[in-house]
Amino acid sequence: MVSDLRSWKKGLQAVPLKPGVLKELGKNGQREALHKYRESTLNSGLNFKDVLKEKAELGEDADDKKVLVLSYPQYCRYRSIIARLRERPSSLLTDHVVLALGGIASLTNSTQILYCRDTFEHPTLVENESVCDEFAPNLKGRPRKKKLSISQRRDSQSGGARESNGVEGKTLVKMRADSKSGVSKPRNPSTGSCKRVQSENKPKGDGGDECRTDEQAFLVALYKYMKERKTPIERIPYLGFKQINLWTMFQAAQKLGGYEVITARRQWKNVYDELGGNPGSTSAATCTRRHYERLILPYERFTKGEEDKPLPPAKPRKQEGSVQESIIKAKMMPIKRPKDEQKTPRGDKDASAKVLELGMEDMEELQEKQNSQQLQAPTQTDRDPNSPLTEDDEGVLVIKDEDQPVLHNAYEHANGGLLPSLPQDGAQLKSEDCDAFPVAAVPLHHGHPLPNSHTSDQWKHGILEYKVPPSALANVEQSRPKEGQNQVVMVLPTLQQKPVTSPEIPPERVEPLKKEESCFNFNPLLYPRGNPGIMSPLAKKKMLSQVSGTGLLNNYPYGPPPPLVSRRLSSSGTEVSSAGQSSSQVSSSVETSIVIKRPSVIQHAQSFKSRGSEDRRSSTEGSQKDGCSEGEPVHHSQTLIREPYLKRVDPHSSMEKSAEMPRPGQAPSFLSEFYSSPHLHNLCRQTEHHLSKEQISKYLSRDVYTRDSETAQGFPPSQHPDNVGLNFSARLSQKEKGPPPERVTEEQPTDLSLPKSSPLKLPLSTSTLGGIPHAAIQQDIKNSPHFQAGNSQSSSVDYHPRACRVPPMTVSASKKVTESHSKVLEKTPNSRGEESMGFKIDEMSRPILSTKSSPQNICTARPLKRNIEDLENGPTEKKIRAVTPLHCSTQRDLPGKPRTPEADSESVKPAEPAVHINSYTSEGHKIPLHSHLFQGLYPGTFVSQVQDMCESLGSHVTPSYSHPLQYLKNQAVLSPLMPPFAIHSLMMQRQFLAANPAHMYRHQVGTSYGDILHPGLYPMSALHPQPAFSPPQLSSVHPSTKLS
């Protein structure tokens, strides 16, 4: 304020009111009202009462203001009003409307109006004498503490001194805090907090000093102790918008009884109130307790002589996390529960059931630890022994195979243990068990290794030959819960979802389930079971390459090949048997289905497929039947059982099946799949099955083969090639979880001719051979002319293609050629014959291209089934159905090492082909391990790799192979690509056509599947003439689709 107006050279002079107006305002009492209004408005709501009071004490007139400093907006409004009221009476300035619009009624004639455009702060202003802090207005903003009481507000508004108001406010706040925190303990002013004492006794210096002394002593001792404890207090946190006063917090806590008492009584909110925090805080108690625990609790315990315990854990968070984990686990468990619920009691398989339950419990425990594991374990345990359990078990087994080669053996043994009981129900159980390949079965196997297990002779036939040491089984079982479950986590989502459906239809599952289960082993991994047969050429190619590369010949991205009549029958029979039907019933149904569904390379692939329980049953049954007629019934059955794609059937049904279905004569139902993805899958399985059988017969030393397989490259050391196959299948299944076709492409080298080494492939090949040492297979392939041709190029353990012979199966030597021809021609009602017809038709109608994983497709473009004449003709042999080669399946398929169908289906279902190979061997079919056809199909490098792989097997293989499937086996062994021989069928067809189209198509077109399977149907020369083509050739052969 300026007393001398002359000192102001700038500013706007306020329009004064006329004296008459002022007098009237004084008379009406409006002057005082106008004054108050101006004070409140022009001061922007600031409380200048203390300033006005000071001025009154100085004798200055409140109305005698010489200068008004307005904000810039106010100044602008005032100028605008003055401009509008020009030439108007000044009395309008007192109008409330004008005042509201920014008008100012000046009560004096000497008021200057200024405006403040900006505000600033400067260090010198603090010490400037012109700045009177004592006259600063009381800022009214959001209270940072508790609201003032009504009395305090009244005092503040009454005009008390600012200082006295501040003191009163502090005292009132403290009193309220005391009353609040003293709910349990009334607060005593004498023992109040130091802060309160200071505020109350501010005039008393002694009280403040004592409190400060105590506080300083406490803080020194606290900081020292915490530093010695190596937990120094570096920064004091804020609580409720203000920094925590450690001394106040400590005193408040001690008054309430200390940490333990406060925590027990839940009085931390009282401590928070004592600290003067925000009353609206919802986490006051927890935050206060945690700060106390970190900053003061250790010292409190030290002062009380208590042991320095670790700070209490953050219970809420951990509890929440554990609850969430448990919830997730519980949710995961229900996912498997559908299968678990579907599980049917196995009365006749006490040991098997026990093993399954044990495996399930282990799995469940692991599953609890791992959600995916949880899913696997419940599914295996809860699933039907036959259908649900089979599928889930397969899924688990596949994973285990990845983990351990022992899994195949364990599966076989477990299945053996299970199936021995199941065979009592019927071969159906075998098939399903093979399919299921439950981890639980592995424990069973421990109890009684499949080879030694005689609970069911039929099962023994299917699996006994493939022996797995109990220790291996134990390892597999152990790995199953751990590794298998982990892997299953990836696979189970698909597998379990599909298996859940199939378990629901134990008898019906024969149709859908067989497909689904066969696919379930690996198809669910590669492709959803729900889209069988639907696959783009690229997807097919990928699938084929992946299957061959991974050894999952029967892993069809499309899903299981359409169930053969025999396979469906066998599946239904198997399920019926496991459901409780008599073994004979199961056998009959299985026989029918087996006959229709003779084990073939495709069946071998089926064993590779997840759905394998049904497929395995039929293939196993077929293999068992073949084995029986050939004299290797038990081994073949075991091999079939082992090889998931071979349908397992009761020994009777399998024996009947072998009799009924001469593998060579009948076109396997898988041939239909040979063209379409499902059909292709079946074809691969059956072909592989037959090849495995023949190879088994050829490589009688299963043990040797097993050793080789186990020692074979890429095969996890396992006592049984099947386990290896399982491991491989597990890996494959995990890989296949993603879009199967894409995965195949990714996994397989761009050049299909080049085998893509993959741990999965190797295990599959080994398993597929059914225990035949991989080296042995290689040697056999070497020995065979075809293999010799491709030896240098295709020797590669990694790509042990399932040496799958298209000739589905000849149980007996006489049956092989004769029955295969007759059955192909006659379309014998036997499952074989029926299958031959169906497959022939399918094969004729479906180009190999559609085949996903059958090397057979490579050779046969459309005429998967050759006419009997073609079978008789040597050249037809050239039409070799390059069904998914049995890399390891051939080895596994060897009589000595029948793969567990489930294990095979999990890893690769080539084991069943091995069983078929055994039957073929019994029948006298020689399986050329390698053929020039494969050489022609695969580049020299590929063939050499396969040959190298087979070189070890070559010693076991005779140079010439009488059976047309021999070349398939040779091919499978020859080219690591045989699992890749799952090379896209179209590519293979084109390649064959390019190499020697006339031979290939001539053989393919005129022949039936059975004919192809017959030994001697295709001359080895026909295969040999085909020159090996380079990888680029393969690519050119299949230009429409990327091979990688």
UniProtKB/Swiss-Prot annotation:
Pfam families: ARID. One of its GO terms (molecular function) is transcription coactivator activity. The keyword Phosphoprotein does not apply. Residues 212-304 form the ARID domain. It is found in: Nucleus. One of its GO terms (biological process) is positive regulation of DNA-binding transcription factor activity. Transmembrane segments: none annotated. Residues 565-591, 752-767 have a biased composition (Low complexity). Residues 143-211, 301-350, 363-392, 554-591, 603-672, 733-767, 811-835, 884-912 are annotated as: Disordered. It comes from the Eukaryota. InterPro entries: ARID/SWI1_ChromRemod, ARID5B_ARID/BRIGHT_DNA-bd, ARID_dom, ARID_dom_sf. Residues 197-211, 301-310, 337-350, 611-635, 644-660, 733-746, 816-826, 894-909 have a biased composition (Basic and acidic residues). Residues 369-380 have a biased composition (Polar residues). Its main location: nucleus. Keywords: Activator, DNA-binding, Nucleus, Transcription, Transcription regulation. GO terms for cellular component: nucleus. Belongs to the ARID5B family. Transcription coactivator that binds to the 5'-AATA[CT]-3' core sequence and plays a key role in adipogenesis and liver development. Required for adipogenesis: regulates triglyceride metabolism in adipocytes by regulating expression of adipogenic genes. The ARID domain mediates the interaction with DNA. This is AT-rich interactive domain-containing protein 5B. It comes from Danio rerio (Zebrafish). The gene is arid5b.
